[in-house]
Amino acid sequence: LSSSNPNLQNIPIRNEDGKEIRKAFIPEDGCEFFSADYSQIELRIMAHLSGDKNMIEAFREGDDIHAATAAKVYKIAIEDVTREQRSKAKTANFGIIYGISVFGLAERMNVPRQEAKELIDGYFDTYPQIKEYMDKSIERARANGYIETIFGRKRFLPDINSRNAVVRGYAERNAIN
């Protein structure tokens, strides 16, 4: 699902303009509107697809997934996670499942590459089945020339075996998305 110009799926609620915009939507008589919160849906789907026990456990326990990731990566108690550590973990959580590189993560977080590398390594140490799932997805794409969705749709990736690292990297990121 998507919408644009305007994006009616993401109308602001925390400011006055957003509150006024929302008043314009009125259900027909006998009907009601409902709201669905897809909180961290990408991470929840990745936890399911990969079967990663640590991430599944964090969701089942109702933990703040970004704080839980920070706690595990930085090897501290969840209650000791700082705002900055949580923010970095959040960037890593979403960036990594979309195939961000050490360089890309360092740029996005404005940190040295070594710190970004340590964060990615810590992430995969924490969630090893996610790494395994991503690697196997790329492996299957290389062997077949496509990746298949859970509904059987094939996404062809003609550049997955390219000799050009940049072109191949783009196809590999598409294989895990």
Give, region by region, the residue ranges found by the protein language model.
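Conserved catalytic core of nucleic-acid polymerases
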Residues: 71-177
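Acidic, glycine-rich two-metal-ion catalytic cores of nucleic acid-processing enzymes
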Residues: 1-80, 142-177
